[in-house]
Amino acid sequence: EIMPSLVGSEMCIRDSLYGGAISGMDWQTIGDSVRSYRYQYDGLGRLTSADYLESGHSSDRYVTEYSYDLMGNILTLSRSGKVYDKIYGITDDLTYQYDGNRLIRVTNHAADTPAYKDAMYYVDGADLDTERTYDANGNMTSNADSRISRISYDALNMPCRIDYIDGSHIDYTYAADGVKQRIDYYLNPYTSSLPDDDCGTACDSSLLVHTWREYAGNCVYVCDTLNMILINGGYITFDYTTHQPIYHYYLKDYLGNNRITVSLADGHIEEVNHYYPFGGLMGDSRNATTQPYKYIGKELDRTHGLDWYDHGARHYDPVTGRWNTMDKMCEKYYLSLIHISEPTRLGM
């Protein structure tokens, strides 16, 4: 299928495999070559490689490979990407270690640490036998690689505070039904980069800068100032001088990923997002900090290297391809031999 765009972008989904999996995809934006992925799967339908092409020719710039254990957990992950400006190489050569199904250690064997700030890659910040810990509910409570010393959870198993070893912390506030209402960032300016829309002020601790985001329905406020109004297919901002609304719209792919953001005011492309399998952002993405809603339309938080997608019920890490907490509905089974297809005539 072809999805044409008013701004000269197209998305082409390659022929599907007999099992329903997609064998490849092509995409292109104005002024860019045609980019492609060709997918390979194992006998259980799990993605084993994504071969990358530009203008129909094989390229090793964004190649990825995966292997799994018998329970479906990723054992190894190899990912190439942007290391420096116009220089590409292997950014992630990861091996995973588990305690049952709980990920306890990730080691990055890649030779070079990418210096390109917009690239999304795994930061191997520790070398311990156990780098991640969990509570009795299966929620991750610390991550030494990310310098996270403690993650605290509320009664709904939603993260309410993330503490870092440099003294920084992130606080979450929710409504009674678990809907996120506010995020407060207390960041050490000497060890963390502040958000692009930073309006922070010094808080009680002279080392920390405080900034915050509030969510009121479809309105998003940053430091008490209306930042955007979320609408179907995009969002609205306001001109600082005239206070007139400016409409921005997304061009999505077949998964609902926001690939392109277009300003209705003049029709120019404000943002281009290129995605790895599992939702990570490629280094060739343009103006990727324009707005935070990316993979499957979910909000990406890159503050202090967090790199988590907020799916509402829980958070997802696209760099490792792992969730940070249990699925609340994982044990809510139907009384049927076949659960996923919701059968009616085969019910027991």
What are these regions (language model features)?
Residues 1-13, 338-348:
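Single conserved hydrophobic/aromatic residue that forms the stacking wall/gate
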Residues 2, 7-8, 271, 291, ...:
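Activation loop
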Residues 9-10, 14-176, 181-248, 285-294:
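Acidic/glycine-rich beta-solenoid
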Residues 11, 72, 138, 256-258, ...:
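Cysteine-centered, disulfide-bonded loop motifs in secreted/extracellular proteins
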Residues 31-32, 56-58, 302-305, 332-334:
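Short glycine/serine/proline-enriched coil/turn segments at secondary-structure junctions
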Residues 94, 239-312:
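A motif-centric feature for acidic-aromatic and gly/ser/thr-rich catalytic loops and repeats
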